[in-house]
Amino acid sequence: MTTASPSQVRQNYHQDSEAAINRQINLELYASYVYLSMSYYFDRDDVALKNFAKYFLHQSHEEREHAERLMKLQNQRGARIFLQDIKKPDRDDWENGLNAMECALCLERSVNQSLLELHKLATEKNDPHLCDFIETHYLNEQVEAIKELGDHITNLRKMGALWIGHGRVPL
């Protein structure tokens, strides 16, 4: 194994920021993995909720793209990428659309909190480029994703109450 040579392009990029970005890459890949699990759960023949499957597959691809964008940033800033093991999703059975959406909301809030902490670190390390990068590519998108999931959860709860009110249980 050869030792990596020092970067020619690294400037004003603190080691703590580099490490935090590597952790964020792992979290984004984990989120992608969870959404992939959800997608293929809803694609099963005994579940057969194709729109949920498509929605979560799209979310999986988005999260993977977020990780790739962070990896590109690491290279642009002269940092090194250190990939870690990706944790298995906490469950394999997502039960129903409402439960999966609630889990997705918790996941997105966790990702958002991690990004806010990363932004705080970048501010403390006086790294305006990293602050701008996080603000431009992540923070608003996270707020929009959290709002979208909240809306889906509200609508699914209303639909469930409507079905139960008519003496029927939704499939």
Swiss-Prot record:
It holds the Pfam family Ferritin. GO terms for molecular function: ferric iron binding; ferrous iron binding; ferroxidase activity. It comes from the Eukaryota. Gene3D superfamilies: 1.20.1260.10. SUPFAM superfamilies: Ferritin-like (SSF47240). The modification N-acetylthreonine is found at T2. Residues 11-160 form the Ferritin-like diiron domain. It comes from Ovis aries. GO terms for cellular component: autophagosome; cytoplasmic vesicle; lysosome. It is an enzyme of class 1 (oxidoreductase). Keywords: Acetylation, Cytoplasm, Cytoplasmic vesicle, Iron, Iron storage, Lysosome, Metal-binding, Oxidoreductase. Fe cation 1 binds at E28, E63, H66. It is found in: Cytoplasm; Lysosome; Cytoplasmic vesicle, Autophagosome. Its EC number is 1.16.3.1. InterPro entries: Ferritin (IPR001519), Ferritin-like (IPR012347), Ferritin-like_diiron (IPR009040), Ferritin-like_SF (IPR009078), Ferritin_CS (IPR014034), Ferritin_DPS_dom (IPR008331). Fe cation 2 binds at E63, E108, Q142. The keyword Flavoprotein does not apply. The modification N-acetylmethionine is found at M1. Disulfide bonds: none annotated. GO terms for biological process: immune response; intracellular iron ion homeostasis; iron ion transport; negative regulation of cell population proliferation; negative regulation of ferroptosis. This is Ferritin heavy chain. Oligomer of 24 subunits. There are two types of subunits: L (light) chain and H (heavy) chain. The major chain can be light or heavy, depending on the species and tissue type. The functional molecule forms a roughly spherical shell with a diameter of 12 nm and contains a central cavity into which the insoluble mineral iron core is deposited. Interacts with NCOA4; NCOA4 promotes targeting of the iron-binding ferritin complex to autolysosomes following starvation or iron depletion. Stores iron in a soluble, non-toxic, readily available form. Important for iron homeostasis. Has ferroxidase activity. Iron is taken up in the ferrous form and deposited as ferric hydroxides after oxidation. Also plays a role in delivery of iron to cells. Mediates iron uptake in capsule cells of the developing kidney. Delivery to lysosomes is mediated by the cargo receptor NCOA4 for autophagic degradation and release of iron. It catalyses: 4 Fe(2+) + O2 + 4 H(+) = 4 Fe(3+) + 2 H2O. Belongs to the ferritin family.
